[in-house]
Amino acid sequence: MELPNQHKQTAAEGFVSFLNWLCNPWRRQRTVNAAVAFQKDLLAIEDSEHLDDINECFEESAGAQSQRTKVVADGAYAPAKSNRTRRVRKQKKHKFVKYLVNEARAEFGLPKPTEANRLMVQHFLLRVCKDWGVVTAHVHGNVALALPLVFIPTEDDLLSRALMNTHATRAAVRGMDNVQGEGWWNNRLGIGGQVGLAFRSKXGCLERRPGFSTSVSRGEHPDLVVIPSGRPEKQRQLLRYSGIGGHLLIGIHNNSLSNLRRGLMERVFYVEGPNGLQDAPKPVKGAFRTLDKFRDLYTKNSWRHTPVTSEQFLMNYTGRKLTIYREAVDSLSHQPLSSRDAKLKTFVKAEKLNLSKKPDPAPRVIQPRSPRYNVCLGRYLRHYEHHAFKTIAKCFGEITVFKGFTLEQQGEIMRSKWNKYVNPVAVGLDASRFDQHVSVEALEYEHEFYLRDYPNDKQLKWLLKQQLCNVGTAFASDGIIKYKKKGCRMSGDMNTSLGNCILMCAMVYGLKEHLNINLSLANNGDDCVIVCEKADLKKLTSSIEPYFKQFGFKMEVEKPVDIFERIEFCQTQPVFDGSQYIMVRKPSVVTSKDVTSLIPCQTKAQYAEWLQAVGECGMSINGGIPVMQNFYQKLQTGIRRTKFTKTGEFQTNGLGYHSRYMHRVARVPSPETRLSFYLAFGITPDLQEALEIFYDTHKLELDDVIPTDTYQVSGEHLINGLPN
């Protein structure tokens, strides 16, 4: 009886499956034998240190590589130019694989065989192949062979482990018990048992650190007069928990006469030159007229505005600021604004200083005008700011100013800029003391944007004119300083942030037009990152310094990065959380600053409440981020929050501001997140887990306040030395 065709096909497939089953053990054994032979050949190869020896592994590709493409718009593709022209010679494959393994082991040692570590090592090996220009067709095969070998212990690894388990090692470790603590002293006296008592260090404690005044006094200026009062200077204080934070030394400037003088001299009147202090550079005559195209485009995308009422302006504030501005509004109702209200009342900014980076930095000064002046100008520009940022976005064709966005939104915006380019690279612009370089010409150019949107408004014109020539008094507990300064951005003005954004965006737009290249700008005032094609990088970086110099600004180019996570913007870097990118603050900095309080905590209970607030805010922006979520979990003391941390200064500082619209919660970081965190901050997945264990097992002790000159060694050395 003949079988139907369907049954014949089923029988044939079954027979093939049976043959495959019979052959599988043979195939597996053949693969194992090949792996053993490959590993044996690899061990027989001598390690190479000379690049020439590695170069002999390659040959230049005779033909063109397959064309790679990348989506640059909906339905549009662009060719991706590649410099990968080297093929790995077949007879030298073992040597190149061993080179890859040695490079990875030199970078990571013997990592644990986890998925996060596998992704990290794989990324590193792919980067090495890219740096050597290996053609894409040869990358996968070599990386696939090198990757597992990185996790296999060598004879030296086994010997190292064995050394820790010898009789001599154990005897030496036991001997340490008798040279510590009371046991050592008893043994020296010949009394008591021959057993040492190890010292137990405290897990951490509270530390009060007083503010300081600079010992530097440089320069003279005829428009600056110092008038000492003879009274002693008042001390500012920081309260810090030592034992869980980072290794950085954090300090604060006192509002003293010496600090005021140095701050005004070095941050208002003069800039650093090759031979010491000198006047800030002046813009080339007519330079800002070259930026008229951006101003006209801005005006075209904007519209006429009218000032808001005083009550509408007050709705932007709460707490102490609301009280101050309400009193100013009341006084304006029976006493009109005058030129006296435009005078500056200057003081030293109270901020956390990284003294590990700069032991004695020039103090920063805040130069506000009277609240009455701020109310009048704020009625024009406080609500106008958000409109201005949207208009700038229209000019660039994308979101450009990051102010007002959450850290999650900023991460996604930055990623969208990165994805626009086939071979992207990011360049940070370091504006050296931007406010100080804002000339009269720069201010007048900025003011044109406002005056065009408030046409024929005489009061706004008068208010802005007061910023061109500044008269002020700096107040300290031990004296005052009277001074005059033409031009320069006054840091307390209502339009400081908005004005800096407009100026920087205008200049970068002009640079883009001047070079005729495509670029994307991420801006937050004087903090900027430019993303462009790698092919345009040299043209861009060589033009930045001379281009900005013609406008009177000193601009330095930071090291370009071609790894997305390495972008540094406003002291944050992007990290992938498993579903999206989020901007994350630097662990090496925030673990020191976020356990240091500027708010005067009078009792340990208040400081414990402050730590609880920091922990809650930190968790809301770092949930799911390795290391950081464990750090902020530990800061949560369980103390119920009161008005002390729910209102006032805490809600307006950086951490409180960033956490307002974010509600992240703790979750286990994915391997992809650990890889991204490593790429951003250089902390390997193994070290991430070690830090997390340290934070999870640490006990907060808020019992004592120790002298400020006491340095307590703790687990903070785990973070010391990590890349910034």
From Swiss-Prot:
Pfam family, one: Tombus_P33
This protein's name: RNA-directed RNA polymerase
Lineage summary: Viruses, Riboviria, Orthornavirae, Kitrinoviricota, Tolucaviricetes
Family annotation (InterPro entries): DNA/RNA_pol_sf, Rev_trsase/Diguanyl_cyclase, RNA-dir_pol_PSvirus, RNA_pol_HCV, Tombusvirus_p33
Domain RdRp catalytic: 424-540
Catalyzed reactions per annotation: RNA(n) + a ribonucleoside 5'-triphosphate = RNA(n+1) + diphosphate
Known function: RNA-dependent RNA polymerase that plays an essential role in the virus replication.
Presence of the UniProt keyword Nucleotide-binding in the record: yes
Record key words, sorted: Nucleotide-binding, Nucleotidyltransferase, RNA suppression of termination, RNA-directed RNA polymerase, Transferase, Viral RNA replication
Gene3D superfamilies: 3.30.70.270
Gene Ontology terms: biological process: viral RNA genome replication
One term of GO molecular function: RNA-directed RNA polymerase activity
Coiled coil start-end: none
Family under the similarity heading: Belongs to the tombusviridae RNA polymerase family.
Enzyme Commission (EC) number: 2.7.7.48
Top enzyme class: transferase
KW Transferase (keyword) present: yes
Note: Readthrough of the terminator UAG occurs at position 203.
